[in-house]
Regions:
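N-terminal secretory signal peptides that target proteins for export/translocation
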Residues: 1-6
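Bacterial N-terminal signal peptides
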Residues: 7-21
Length: 230
């Protein structure tokens, strides 16, 4: 039996080495320093730096003449290649002065962005709905969409209530969101909650990949800070 000790020890060590080498490696966290707009591709708008409620932030704005029109502004983070993982950001959105009452301060994060924002998955918030006096309006506070085919109108018509939900929000107030993505599933967390406010188990583009982008509506005063990608 003494002659088997070394082979057994060698076998054990080899097995341990294989186990460690084949174990999944934890995703590394990457904090994006938002002290300049140089690292973004801006689509359908413009971006600048501002100090908002004590935080240095990226300020997304519509192009001149589009301040009250119905369109999207994207700030695509150059060099990102996101498939699975997590995205965190602090954001603050409120309707621009003079905006129609139906405009709710739409603001959010797009992921797996392709073709200069023609294609994307997205979670966004409607801050003005968060404390509305009617429950049905509150239930439209958080939204998932998938451009270009699955707009909020289509999703609400075909599957009412499945891709939007209530979450407590205030317009113009810093709000932390976290998006966790795995395969064709994604979850949205707000303000450090341990449970998601919105769960999507069938992302419309399946297991795709692409860039990460800040997003706002043209009628929104939109600010972003403390972006982190894991």
């Amino acid at each position: 039996m003494r002659g088997f000790r070394f082979p057994l020890l060698l076998l054990f060590c080899c097995g341990l080495l294989f186990t460690l080498s084949s174990a999944p490696v934890a995703a590394q966290s990457s904090k994006v320093k938002l002290d300049s707009t140089d690292g973004f591709e801006i689509v359908n708008g413009k971006a600048g730096m501002a100090t908002y409620r004590g935080q240095k932030a990226v300020h997304l704005m519509p192009l001149a003449g589009h301040e009250l029109t119905d369109g999207s502004v994207f700030a695509i983070l150059k060099g990102t290649d996101f498939k699975d993982g997590a995205i965190e950001v602090d954001l603050a959105g409120a309707p621009r002065p003079g905006a129609d009452p139906s405009m709710k301060g739409f603001i959010g994060i797009a992921f797996r962005v392709q073709s200069h924002a023609e294609v994307s998955e997205m979670f966004y918030l409607r801050p003005s709905n968060g404390r509305a006096p009617e429950q049905l309006t509150r239930n439209h506070s958080a939204q998932y969409v998938s451009d270009p085919d699955f707009t909020w109108q289509r999703l609400r018509t075909e599957t009412p209530g499945k891709y939007e939900s209530y979450v407590d929000l205030e317009p113009g107030v810093w709000t932390k969101i976290r998006i966790e993505v795995a395969g064709a599933k994604a979850r949205l967390y707000v303000n450090g909650a341990s449970q998601p406010c919105l769960i999507v188990n069938d992302l419309k583009r399946g297991e795709s990949r692409g860039q990460v982008a800040l997003w706002s509506h043209e009628t929104t005063e939109a600010y972003f800070a403390n972006l982190k990608i894991e």
